[in-house]
Amino acid sequence: GLVEDYGYYSSGESFSISDPEEVWIMELIGKGEGEKGAVWVALKVPDGYISGHANQARITTFPKNDPENCMFAEDVISFAREKGWYEGTDEDFSFSDVYVPVDFGGARFCEARVWAGFNKVASGMEKYTEYARGVVKHAGPNNFASNRMPLWVKPDKKLSVQDVMGMMRDHFEGTVLDMTQDI
């Protein structure tokens, strides 16, 4: 492919790719100095669900044997091992936690925007408020972030264009992150 032949220089990008039948979210990160190419993962968003991204890699673990719903660079895991960034099992490999670990800034200034959109249209998002405030907890054998939001949520109702516009325009009004409340 083009990235393998010509390279890719970026700390990372997230893409929403869609047609009338399906939507995919793809994350792509250049291999860095002295390397050519990129590592990437793409996941199909399940029917009836929504996803979002805002300047922070969000794909964590992913199925390795489901080409109908997941595609990834052949060396996405082996490259991390070669660099000494990951020693765990293939099953536990988390793209975001290995290549772009979420920190306070990633959670508070990027993921919080996704949380705000999800919070407007899906019940149960209050359990991720602490994470949206920038509190990232770590656990497990690889010490990955353990309180992250899901990559996608099922909205409480079918969304209208106006609903989506409201999500895009949200500034945390009416939440604990409301900037008019001096937080």
For every predicted segment, state its role.
Residues 1-44, 183:
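Structured, non-membrane catalytic/scaffold regions adjacent to prosthetic-group chemistry
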Residues 6-10, 20-23, 47-183:
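C-terminus-biased signal that marks the final domain/tail of proteins
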